[in-house]
């Protein structure tokens, strides 16, 4: 809440200034891309926006169509994208970025961190639970190895053989529903059913009145004719 209030205050103050401020968004996933486009549409000239992404492409776990539309949206808005880059240090006025060319120190006014999810497993410091990618490894029934009466779902877990599933609400909700049904089966003395993810598609907001939708065999770029709104 403190960080959100700080960001809100910074953006409101920036709306009333002609200064060209340098804003860095760390993370080229959905949150980072949506935020970059939205801020640029609201504050057209106040910011130089830079998106920092550690991999070689933005939205690397999202659908190709949405990624391509996002790249076009960023280019149209003159938002800089720094690929294969990571943040080494952030000070009051500088941000140090490590890339293929070395470490570069750049001036900054604000840094917004959207670089993904890392669960806190400090309370599970034990060799009896197998972990992968910093998450609890489970089978396709969500059972923890060697602990068949213990289950893990959502951001804290990774399903063996399904490591590429995105960390999204859609996946977590389906996991929750499936686990609830499996628990009922187990209570009845029946075998649990393996989880199968049903991809219902995804939508990425690309600024004011613009979005990319991909799924269920359909790819759409939506652009609203409505006027630009303002920051309130």
Give a label for each model feature.
Residues 43-140:
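A Rossmann-like FAD-binding core segment of flavoenzymes
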Residues 222-232:
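Single conserved hydrophobic/aromatic residue that forms the stacking wall/gate
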Residues 22, 46-50, 149:
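Residues at the starts of beta-strands that form the adenosine-phosphate
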């Amino acid at each position: 809440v403190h960080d959100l209030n700080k960001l809100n205050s910074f953006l409101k103050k920036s709306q009333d200034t002609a200064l060209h401020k340098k804003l860095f968004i760390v993370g080229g996933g959905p949150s980072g891309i949506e935020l970059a486009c939205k801020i640029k549409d609201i504050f057209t000239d106040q910011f130089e926006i830079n998106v920092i992404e550690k991999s070689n492409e933005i939205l690397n776990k999202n659908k190709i169509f949405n990624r391509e539309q996002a790249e076009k949206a960023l280019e149209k808005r003159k938002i800089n994208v720094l690929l294969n880059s990571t943040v080494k240090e952030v000070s009051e006025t500088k941000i140090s970025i490590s890339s293929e060319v070395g470490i570069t120190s750049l001036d900054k006014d604000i840094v917004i961190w959207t670089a993904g999810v890392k669960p806190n497993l400090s309370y599970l410091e034990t060799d009896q639970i197998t972990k992968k990618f910093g998450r609890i490894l489970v089978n396709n029934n969500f059972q923890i190895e060697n602990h068949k009466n213990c289950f893990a779902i959502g951001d804290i877990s990774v399903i063996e053989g399904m490591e590429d599933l995105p960390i999204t609400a859609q996946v977590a909700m389906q996991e929750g529903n499936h686990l609830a049904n499996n628990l009922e089966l187990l209570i009845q003395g029946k075998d649990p059913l393996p989880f199968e993810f049903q991809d219902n598609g995804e939508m990425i907001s690309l600024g004011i009145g613009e979005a990319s939708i991909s799924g269920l065999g359909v790819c759409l770029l939506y652009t609203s004719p409505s006027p630009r709104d303002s920051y309130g």
